[in-house]
């Protein structure tokens, strides 16, 4: 007997008080301990022109020196280079992957510059989807390479966004969390920088580019995120060099006219970027990647494969029903293909039989022709043989007659000689 158990509604749930300590209040601690032991992964995609300061900013953000090869402006196309690192802060381990867009914006024809980036992001989604679809999944040990944040480096022109930037961000906004930043912000005057920021945000809105929205629905981060959102795009300066300022050493850039401190919020937005990207919203970026961007890719892929939540009448459609429907569809296609192949095979066999019969007929005709030719040649040879035999017989007869005449002549000559000798005596 099968008993159907329905999902209880909220009205059926009752709040009960506990008479003693049970222990499930330790669930948050269990989750923290499990996450700490497993470690975390975070993947950053840096999109920007060559020499705009992507590597320097990454070094500054994470207070370390990552491996980086100096890039030239002679790349034939855009290629993506990913490097992974193991970082540890206190007892928290982070597997960080930094993906650089080498050669971006260096080509004369920039129409397809975004394609390698889109293909790379989709490839990481596809790899994760294939791991999910395995019968024996191993997501616990799987190295998740999906991009969690895209830092889009905008050149400090002070005017407006380049068409390449708008096209690329529009192609990426449904696939990744875009955080626009103005690179090398120390090259723009402060009053121009404010206008430049407003211009960029206006162009993004007018062109329908969806950038990452800092979450404001959680009380713990709502206030700081709401405050920081007005500073987008962040104007940043990166530097790993320390300069003495007063009695302290600070990361800064030294110029003849003065010093630009990286962590001074009056000089640039580096601290705001670090707060938003790492200290406040890193987990939300990871969650948004999985629940929004990856789910969109997964849904599209499953729909391409024929899996849907509802049937044509908008009725719920279970996975088992989808499987049966697709199985029947594939079986029908298979039978159709088999019948087509059978018909094709029969047709090919008939064509081959006709070819073989025609070839056999030609061979018989050639054989008959050769046979007649052989018989004619044989007859000619036999006739020649008879002629030769007759000639040989005639020759033998003539030879015998000649020998007889010669013998008779010799005998008569001998007799004549004997008579002559007798006369002399």
UniProtKB/Swiss-Prot annotation:
Main location: cytoplasm
Superkingdom of origin: Eukaryota
Keywords: Cell cycle, Cell division, Cell projection, Coiled coil, Cytoplasm, Cytoskeleton, GTP-binding, Nucleotide-binding, Phosphoprotein, Synapse
Residue ranges of the region described as G4 motif: 183-186
Region (G1 motif): 48-55
A single BP term in Gene Ontology: cell division
GO-annotated cellular components: axon; dendritic spine; septin complex
Subunit structure: Septins polymerize into heterooligomeric protein complexes that form filaments, and can associate with cellular membranes, actin filaments and microtubules. Forms homooligomers. GTPase activity is required for filament formation. Interacts with SEPTIN7, SEPTIN9 and SEPTIN12.
PANTHER family attached to this UniProt entry: SEPTIN
Name under which the protein is recorded: Septin-11
Naturally occurring in which organism (per UniProt): Pongo abelii (Sumatran orangutan)
């Amino acid at each position: 007997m099968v008993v159907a158990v329905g999902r209880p509604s909220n009205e059926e749930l009752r709040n009960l008080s506990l008479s003693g300590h049970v222990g499930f209040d330790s669930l948050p601690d269990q989750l923290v301990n499990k996450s700490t032991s497993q470690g975390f992964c975070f993947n950053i995609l840096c999109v920007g022109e060559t020499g705009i300061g992507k590597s320097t900013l990454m070094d500054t953000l994470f207070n370390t020196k990552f491996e980086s090869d100096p890039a030239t402006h002679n790349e034939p196309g855009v290629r993506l280079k990913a490097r992974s690192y193991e970082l540890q802060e206190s007892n928290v381990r982070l597997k960080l992957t930094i993906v650089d867009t080498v050669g971006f914006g260096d080509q004369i024809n920039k129409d397809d510059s975004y394609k390698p980036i889109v293909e790379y992001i989709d490839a990481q989604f596809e790899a994760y989807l294939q791991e999910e679809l395995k019968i024996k999944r191993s997501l616990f040990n799987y190295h998740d390479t999906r991009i969690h944040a895209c830092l889009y480096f905008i050149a400090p022109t002070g005017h407006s966004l380049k068409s390449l930037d708008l096209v690329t961000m529009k192609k990426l906004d449904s696939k990744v969390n875009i955080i626009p930043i103005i690179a090398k912000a120390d090259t723009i005057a402060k009053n121009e920088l404010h206008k430049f920021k407003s211009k960029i945000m206006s162009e993004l809105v007018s062109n329908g580019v969806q950038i990452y929205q800092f979450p404001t629905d959680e009380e713990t981060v709502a206030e700081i995120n709401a405050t920081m959102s007005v500073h987008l795009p962040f104007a940043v300066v990166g530097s790993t060099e320390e300069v003495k300022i007063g009695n302290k050493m600070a990361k800064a850039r030294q110029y003849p006219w003065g010093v630009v401190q990286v962590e001074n919020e009056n000089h640039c937005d580096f601290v705001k970027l670090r707060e938003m990207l790492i200290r406040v919203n890193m987990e939300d970026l990871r969650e948004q990647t999985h629940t929004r961007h990856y789910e969109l890719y997964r849904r599209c892929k499953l729909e391409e494969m024929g899996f849907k939540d509802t049937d044509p009448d908008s009725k719920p459609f279970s996975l088992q029903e989808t499987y049966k429907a697709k199985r029947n569809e594939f079986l029908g296609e298979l039978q159709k293909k088999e019948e087509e192949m059978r018909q094709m095979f029969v047709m090919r066999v008939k064509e081959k039989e006709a070819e073989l019969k025609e070839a056999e007929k030609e061979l018989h005709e050639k054989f008959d022709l050769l046979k007649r030719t052989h018989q004619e040649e044989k007859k000619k040879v036999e006739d020649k043989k008879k002629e030769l035999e007759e000639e040989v017989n005639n020759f033998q007869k003539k030879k015998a007659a000649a020998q007889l005449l010669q013998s008779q002549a010799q005998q008569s000559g001998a007799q004549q000689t004997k008579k002559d000798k007798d006369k002399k005596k």
